[in-house]
Every structure is written in structure tokens, then in C-alpha cells.
């Protein structure tokens, strides 16, 4: 059994066996008797490295044995291994020639937080969002068949990710094309199966054995010649398995279901995977693991230890903190507004903690809806609620709202329904990298007719603009970033602002900075040196055209600033207005460039994009020099 640790090691642990398994090829040269010791060493090393860098924590600890077994049995990278989401991929990175690079995890120019094709040939598919693995692995399996190659395709997906419709679409299609592939359900929440023991492991060995598989295929060939006989036999087998194992749903979808088995039992994992490797058609293995396995605090609190920050050196000064987190301001606003309006309903696609809906869910459980990883459903659910006079608020990360764009337009906006979108993690998100960045929401929202799009500059504005959007007659969106605000005093009253009106924060000379969002603080830092006017625009749509017209008539240069893609963003809205009205004033658009900004500290990412104070000042001075 895996050893259980109670503290994260600060010193690098001795890992003599892991040192001999830097690649899957080296791993496969070890004896099976060595694998359990290897698992203990890998878990200790994982604890140590994540303690040094911070990062996703519990999921990786839970798949140590599964990761070892997969690379031990399958011929990776020739066999294709696809991890869903990627939270659990750190052990995979350690075993695939990146152990000595783990100290650079999530740092600028270092290892990414998720599997990346550009990083390693063992990362067969780039991930970050959930529920994509089965579709990707199926595509690889079909390609292998068409290319005449014998390689295997394996997808590892969690029970949470399996709630998304995309996963079931792929399961259904795979059975239709009779794909030779293996899906492994990593059930680390016990949400599907609650009992795993000797009987389940024993049955898995039998049902995945070559003898059973050969007998099954032979019987199929014989009985298929007799009308109705094979169907009767198939149903009999299905019912018998259904009495003992919980895989009826997957059997009905056309998959050969094996499990559940103990995901921390290496001998059983290796034996079962070896058997299933050679089986034809769509195979489904149900593995039960414990999130945070081997680290006692994470086992007791898997949500709290989903990810951790790096350990601080003993005696180091406490980090300076800013104001409250923007998500916390939203969470408090939601509770306050719910107390005033019984029609308010809160919806989240599996982001209760991240979006700060915990307090709301406890105070108003009957008005709180966690729809799991189902963004499309979340948006249309809100639309249905709005049809009946309710006031739904969808709390969702910017990057995940992309997955429900059709529902946003077709089900909400076209019908002009009262749905408020509280869009968290807008802009750059730091160490999680481009898959989690909210780089495009202004661009994809401002083109939707009737949509109210707002960009608060601080905590107080966030609260006011949430109220404004909530009271608006139609669909509204408020975007706000990850992290803390500048500690601006917050008005406790639920007061809206006038729609489509920005605020001039400073009057200056020939340059006007038009700020959409939290870069206001950076703009104010350089305003005096540039003698610039600073406008807190607040609204992307409707744009404060009167303010833009005024500033265009009294300044020699307008500069739009936003933490969104320049292409199609708020600056584009300003440029379109200037062109439409024939206002001949130069416009400099500052925002996110036309490439994916790689993972780094948020400050490093903003500096790269020229959105910190120094970058803004440099860009403005260079433009003035050319005029």
C-alpha cells in the first residue's frame, strides 16, 4: 500500500529507483516488484516539486499508480496517451524525461501547467479544458486505422469531466465506428461507484482476460449465424454483468466495460491493462482512486488541496496583499442582491469555490445550481429560468464561456432574456497559461446585438456594474480579472450607474488614455508624466460615444487600453466609432497581441504585452515621437 505523508518535504528526497526511470523506456526495464517502491518515490518527489513551485496538487497524487501502470504497459509515445484537463499530469511529466525540469513548472519559459504538444512527444494532445480526451483519442484511433498502424489510443478522464455532453458524444461515436481504443474513467470522487474491493478486482481480471475475451469473440462468431441467438446471448451477458458491476450505461453505449478496480493496486492495474491492451473495439476501464492519495491533509480536504501555492522559506516576510479578491466581491454582491430579490438564482458550471459561490450556496441552497462541467446547459438553463420571470446570474470563467457561445447567442441574446453573466478570470491568468486566459470575451461579446458589456476598474465599480447589469432589461456581462483589487473603498449600497457613461478620472493635455478595466491603476501611474487625460470607460457596449467625441476633439492622440485581444476588442469599438463619425484623430490600441501569451507570473505577462505602467508609457511616447 502507498505510504502516507503528513508534511510536504522541503528537501529533495532520495529517489534511487525513480532516478532509473527518467523515461517510459527505462521504466519498462524495471521489474514489476519494483513498481510499488517507485510509486512511493514518485509521490514523494511530486510533493517536493509542487511544494517548490506551487500548482495542481491532489489530482496528480491520486494517479501515481495509474500513471506508472500506463507507461509500463503501453508503448508510449508510439501508443497515444491523452489526459483529460491535465490537472493530474504532473506524474506523467516526471516519468517522461522532464523530472529535472519540474522546478520550472508554471514559470516563464518553464514547463507548462498542462500537457502541451510543443513541450514533449509524450504529450499527444494539448489540454486545459475538460472533457476533450475521448474525442481526441478517438480521432487518433481512426487515423491509426486509416494509416494501417497498430498503435493504441488511451484516454484518461475523470468522473467530473464525464458529466459533459462532449464526452458522451465521443463515447457514442466511438461505438458506432467500433474504434480500437481504451477509455479509463478515473473515478476519484466515488460519484459513480461506492464499493471497490476484492470481488470487483477479481471480476475485472476475469472479464479482461484473454481466455474470456477469446471465448466471447468465438461465441459471437458462432452465434451470429443463428438468427436472434447472439442478441439473446449478448443480453444475458449484459444482465449478468449488470448485477455485479455498475457499467450498464457504458455497455448500452456499446463499450466493453471492466471494473471498478482499485486504482492504487499496481498488480491489478498492470494485469488488467495488459489484458485490455490486446482487446479489439471500444474498451472502458473504471478505476477508483483517491484524490490527494499519500498526503494525509489532501486526502481529508481534496477541494482545499486541489492546488497549492509554493512553500515560503522559513522566516520569510509575509507577502503583501492588496484588496479583496474580485471573486469575493462578486460572492458578497450575490448574497446581498439575493437578500433583496427572491427572483435571483445563482448558476455555476462546477466552479463554486473558484467563483466564490460557497456562501450563497449555504444561505440559499434552493436558489443555487451547480450544473457540473456543462457550460452549454448552464447558459440555456438560465435562459429557461429567465423566460419564467426569474433573474439568473451565471458565474463562469471567461475561458469556459467560450464553450457556450451558441447558447449565449441563440438561447439568451436572440430572445433578449434577462441573464447576467459574471465573467471571472477575464484577461491574463498567470501560471495556468493560454488555455485558461480570458483573452477574447470583449471581442466575442461586443458583436452580439442587445448585449450590455461592462469592464469595472476596481472592487467598488465591480459591485456597481453587477447591480447595473442585474437591473438591465436584457442580457448583460461584467468581466473581471483573477486576483485582488487595488483596495478601493466599497460602497455597501446596491447602486447602479448610468448605462453607457464613462468617467474622466484625470484631465490632462494632448493625450487621452481610454481605459477599459483594471489597467486604470497602471494608466494613472503614468498619467502625470505624460500629462494625459485618463477616462475610465466602464462600458464597452454601449460605448460612451459622447465622451469619445469630446476627447477626440480636445486631444492629439487617443490610446485605448484593455486586457483583451486587440483584434475586435474595445479599442476596435473606439476606432469604428471614429471612422464612422469621420473624426480624424490618431488612435493607439493597447491590449493583448495576436499570439498566445505563455504562462508566467501575471506581472511578467502584462510586461510582455506592454500593459504595465512602463509599457503603456513607452508605447505612448514612441507614438508621439512619430506624430
Swiss-Prot record:
Its EC number is 2.2.1.7. One of its GO terms (biological process) is 1-deoxy-D-xylulose 5-phosphate biosynthetic process. Pathway: Metabolic intermediate biosynthesis; 1-deoxy-D-xylulose 5-phosphate biosynthesis; 1-deoxy-D-xylulose 5-phosphate from D-glyceraldehyde 3-phosphate and pyruvate: step 1/1. Its cofactor is Mg(2+); thiamine diphosphate. Mg(2+) binds at residues 159, 188. Keywords: Isoprene biosynthesis, Magnesium, Metal-binding, Thiamine biosynthesis, Thiamine pyrophosphate, Transferase. Pfam families: DXP_synthase_N, Transket_pyr, Transketolase_C. SUPFAM superfamilies: Thiamin diphosphate-binding fold (THDP-binding), TK C-terminal domain-like. Binds 1 Mg(2+) ion per subunit. Thiamine diphosphate binds at residues 87, 128-130, 160-161, 188, 295, 375. The keyword Transferase applies. GO terms for cellular component: cytosol. It catalyses: D-glyceraldehyde 3-phosphate + pyruvate + H(+) = 1-deoxy-D-xylulose 5-phosphate + CO2. PROSITE patterns: TRANSKETOLASE_2 (PS00802). InterPro entries: Dxylulose-5-P_synthase (IPR005477), THDP-binding (IPR029061), Transketo_C/PFOR_II (IPR009014), Transketolase-like_Pyr-bd (IPR005475), Transketolase_BS (IPR020826), Transketolase_C (IPR033248). GO terms for molecular function: 1-deoxy-D-xylulose-5-phosphate synthase activity; magnesium ion binding; thiamine pyrophosphate binding. Belongs to the transketolase family. DXPS subfamily. Catalyzes the acyloin condensation reaction between C atoms 2 and 3 of pyruvate and glyceraldehyde 3-phosphate to yield 1-deoxy-D-xylulose-5-phosphate (DXP). Homodimer. This is 1-deoxy-D-xylulose-5-phosphate synthase. It comes from Pseudomonas paraeruginosa (strain DSM 24068 / PA7). The gene is dxs.
